Amino acid sequence: MQLLQSSVIAATVGAALVAAAPVELEARDSCTFTSAADAKSGKTSCSTITLSNIEVPAGETLDLTGLNDGTTVIFSGETTFGYKEWEGPLISVSGTNIKVQQASGAKIDGDGSRWWDGEGGNGGKTKPKFFYAHKLDSSSITGLQIYNTPVQGFSIQSDNLNITDVTIDNSAGTAEGHNTDAFDIGSSTYINIDGATVYNQDDCLAINSGSHITFTNGYCDGGHGLSIGSVGGRSDNTVEDVTISNSKVVNSQNGVRIKTVYGATGTVSNVKFEDITLSGITKYGLVVEQDYENGSPTGTPTNGITVSGITFEKVTGTVESDATDIYILCGSGSCTDWTWSGVSITGGKTSSKCENVPTGASC
């Protein structure tokens, strides 16, 4: 009888343990972290990571690199960062099939005013870059609300990354913010940015190298516009198969532009600007320049970088009266095979300094 009772008890306990196992596994699948240190140490033990009101210590990165395949990252509450002069980044995420998103009402606030001094990355305080999406492959970033980046917002070096409905609001930096690029893309393929809303003080989009890149349904306010480049002078100097469409650029220095580096070699090909609306542009509505040296135009173009297969279609709107509607400064023979349709930019001056304007385009 005692043996029978023992067997029954053992069976009952065994059944309970089996029943409990899925509950224990589920707990391991979902983790909530309230510190950057815990997130870094525990990031590979969870398939869903919730970052709850994290205060990242000064001089440290919220390190979410090397995540397990298929991990979901959720920003919850307010994510903030301690102050220190350093290069950053403040956030870094890498992995494959990663989903980065946020809970309702969440925000990520860089409090960039602590660094802003009007110098950006050119001097003054050393300012940390914000978000590295490097080797974040076959992944997505959705719905993030980002405020007040000290300098650059996203640095993207990935393959097959979709960024949807992200807001970067640096409107508080109108006076002292500088070089607050929203999306800088290099050495990447199949990057899709859809529905971005950007208030900043530099490029809304800057593609330095890469292929199969789209930017659609964007709103860019206060910065330097939608840019290819500057291209040249890096290890990768090819930009190809890019579509920038259905977007608005307002209250910005430039509307749409392509800029290449003086004396450099490379390729810009199969780039399309389509259905872009401009207003309140203060420098150039549409600009192509092949004269950049040390980040500034020289006025003398070179032809080592070819700019071919370019389409400007239905790029329309207005610039300020002291701005220039269109400026094209190409090297000899380097700008070819352009399609120019429905381009109407008015309100400013007509440039007398255009050179080597390709057939079909108008300056």
Curated annotation (Swiss-Prot):
Catalytic machinery residues: D202, H224
Localisation: Secreted
Annotated signal peptide:
1-20
Gene Ontology terms describing biological process: cell wall organization; pectin catabolic process
Alphabetized UniProt keyword annotations:
Cell wall biogenesis/degradation, Disulfide bond, Glycoprotein, Glycosidase, Hydrolase, Repeat, Secreted, Signal, Zymogen
Q: What is the lineage of its organism?
A: Eukaryota, Fungi, Dikarya, Ascomycota, Pezizomycotina
What is the catalytic activity of this protein? (1,4-alpha-D-galacturonosyl)n+m + H2O = (1,4-alpha-D-galacturonosyl)n + (1,4-alpha-D-galacturonosyl)m
- Looking at its record, which EC class is this enzyme? hydrolase
Primary location recorded for the protein, binned into one broad class: secreted
Q: Could you state one GO cellular component term attached to this entry? A: extracellular region
* Residue ranges annotated as propeptide in the record: 21-28
This chain's function reads: Involved in maceration and soft-rotting of plant tissue. Hydrolyzes the 1,4-alpha glycosidic bonds of de-esterified pectate in the smooth region of the plant cell wall.
Q: Which GO terms describe its molecular function?
A: polygalacturonase activity
Family indicated by similarity? Belongs to the glycosyl hydrolase 28 family.
Where does the UniProt entry place glycosylation sites? N162
Keyword set includes Repeat: yes
Describe where the PbH1 repeats fall, as residue ranges on this chain: 158-187, 188-209, 210-230, 239-260, 268-290, 302-347
Report the domain of life of the source organism: Eukaryota
Q: What is its EC number?
A: 3.2.1.15
Q: What is this protein called?
A: Probable endopolygalacturonase A
Disulfide pairs here are: C31-C46, C204-C220, C330-C335, C354-C363
